[in-house]
Amino acid sequence: MSTDDLDFTKTLAKPIPAPSLQQLESASQEAAVGGAHLRSNGYYVAIARRTTAKVPPRDGERYSLLVVEDDPDLANLLGDIFGDAGFEVRKAKNRAEINAEVNKPLLPDLMLLDIMLPDADGLQILARLRAHSKFARLPVIMMTGKAEVSDVKAGLAAGADGYVSKPFKVSALMMAVNLVLGKG
């Protein structure tokens, strides 16, 4: 493994840096909007930051999506949905599999990241990605059962490009993915 690779199987030697005041303020504003949406719809938050330009597929042909989800039924469902939409879908359910996927020669174009994994905290994984030059710009959408305004704020402040709570509408998740990739 080269020094540019991440190793999620090891714990951090130093704490993850806290978000800046600007990141916290921006996340607070976005989370407030998402919280209003949650109250009006009663069950889900769907926030996605539109990119300034279309993100081209890394392989030049089709987008690759890494689904980090420990529920095999949901991971397979997302694999089917996004596969049918033309994405190459890769899956990981724990630290070791995340580690293997992000250290493959061709990075995914986008990651759907659950916060609550059996052996990892998705927010810590996101923070490590954002702190690493190779992965800092990798689009990441948090996909989680945590839908409180404070949860949304924490995800966005940590650098998530989007936040979709479970249970979600497939159309909302697809819209978030397309917005983050600049396809929508």
Model-derived features: positions:
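Acidic, metal-coordinating helix/loop segments flanking the phosphotransfer/catalytic sites
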Residues: 91-110
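Charged docking surfaces used in two-component/phosphorelay signaling
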Residues: 76-84
